[in-house]
């Protein structure tokens, strides 16, 4: 059953992974994304966090949901930086977002309203709870770079699907 909480920290980090990636994502690595979820599941990972941004985050959440039928105990948790995150999304993506939240095992809403740095706090929240971070990262500046670097500082395993797993490229 799904729970919606403002904050929860009762999971084992070693069995948890998070996703980060660019908003410009058109399914380029969907097969690799599903494969890495299966691989991590085989290594004991059961909980996957999505920050629910446009692009890679939504695709990653959908990949976890699609695999729940074949991977018992697989859980999707969504870290929502503030209510209304999707208000400015295109309508089709806003509907995807709502469908994902409805099917998520847990939704953590981290701030009552938009605040400066709320997206970075969301990224820190996910990384601090994760032993691995799966990325769609081209090496550029921005939120994905911040999360990628923060994962390194937190000693999380980093898997970059952009460069076929050669995560130390960036």
Where are these regions (language model features)?
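Extreme N-terminal basic, low-complexity initiation segments
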Residues: 2-6
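Acidic/glycine-enriched connector segments
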Residues: 7-170
């Amino acid at each position: 059953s799904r729970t919606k909480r403002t904050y929860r920290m009762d999971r084992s980090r070693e069995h948890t992974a998070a996703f980060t990636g660019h908003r410009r994502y058109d399914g380029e690595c969907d097969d690799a994304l599903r494969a890495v979820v299966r691989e991590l599941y085989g290594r004991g990972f059961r909980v996957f966090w999505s920050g629910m941004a446009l692009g890679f985050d939504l695709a990653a959440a959908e990949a976890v949901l699609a695999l729940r039928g074949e991977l018992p105990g697989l859980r999707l948790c969504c870290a929502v930086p503030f209510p209304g995150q999707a208000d400015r999304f295109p309508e089709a993506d806003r509907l995807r977002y709502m469908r994902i939240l409805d099917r998520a095992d847990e939704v953590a809403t981290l701030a009552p309203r938009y605040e400066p740095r709320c997206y970075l706090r969301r990224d820190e929240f996910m990384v601090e709870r994760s032993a691995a971070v799966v990325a769609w990262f081209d090496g550029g500046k921005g939120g994905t770079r911040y999360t990628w670097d923060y994962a390194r500082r937190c000693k999380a395993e980093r898997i970059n699907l952009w460069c076929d797993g050669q995560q130390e490229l960036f």
